[in-house]
Amino acid sequence: MASTNDLKNGLVLKLDGGQLWSVVEFQHVKPGKGPAFVRTKLKNVLSGKVVDKTFNAGVKVETATIDKRDMQFSYMDGEYFVFMDMDTYDQLMVDRKSVGDAANFLIEGFTATVAQHEGEVLFVELPAAVELVIQETEPGVQGDRSTGGTKPATLETGHQIQVPLFITTGEKIKVDTRTSDYLGRVNS
């Protein structure tokens, strides 16, 4: 339990019947008339939904501990992603829903952060940018600007993104894992 006076960004609260909410923003307000209160912006850890919530100052709220561990993606086992703890070599099977959009960028050997609460996997987080190889793309045609200078390309994971016309099959590129945007070539 913590007081609303102790809130800080990143703190995870247990509200609304056990749902986990992360504090994105908070502001202590002391109006000229009336009691002080804390205005917060909270993000649901599982769904990503963002809500505004106001608490009276000094009220106790339940906090939750999220265990984040760096784990290496080993292989797919049916619909499950198998991760290995780099310290204990224990294996953890994570379902596709918990992996989320990170599945578009996972290849064997990648290190990801796996977040758990009371033994349940909440989400899998990748670094902001990863390096992947272009598996397939059409050759860029000189003067083709109808698509704004980009063309579709399939990554080695099977995920499709837009890349500049000069990128060819087999090249290694850097991709933003949050937006699926092309960031640049990787110098070998």
From Swiss-Prot:
SMART domains recorded: EFP, Elong-fact-P_C
GO biological process: peptide biosynthetic process
InterPro entries: Elong-fact-P_C (IPR015365), NA-bd_OB-fold (IPR012340), Rib_uL2_dom2 (IPR014722), Transl_elong_fac_P/YeiP (IPR020599), Transl_elong_KOW-like (IPR013185), Transl_elong_P/YeiP_cen (IPR001059), Transl_elong_P/YeiP_CS (IPR013852), Transl_elongation_fac_P (IPR011768)
Keyword Transmembrane set for record: no
SUPFAM superfamilies: Nucleic acid-binding proteins, Translation proteins SH3-like domain
Pathway(s) served: Protein biosynthesis; polypeptide chain elongation
Protein localization: Cytoplasm
UniProt entry keywords in alphabetical sequence: Cytoplasm, Elongation factor, Protein biosynthesis
Primary subcellular site in the record, as a coarse category: cytoplasm
One term of GO molecular function: translation elongation factor activity
GO CC entries: cytoplasm
Keyword Protease set for record: no
Matches recorded under NCBIfam families: efp, PRK00529.1
Family in the record: Belongs to the elongation factor P family.
HAMAP family in the cross-refs: EF_P (MF_00141)
Function: Involved in peptide bond synthesis. Stimulates efficient translation and peptide-bond synthesis on native or reconstituted 70S ribosomes in vitro. Probably functions indirectly by altering the affinity of the ribosome for aminoacyl-tRNA, thus increasing their reactivity as acceptors for peptidyl transferase.
Protein name per its UniProtKB record: Elongation factor P
Organism: Streptomyces avermitilis (strain ATCC 31267 / DSM 46492 / JCM 5070 / NBRC 14893 / NCIMB 12804 / NRRL 8165 / MA-4680)
Gene name linked to the record: efp
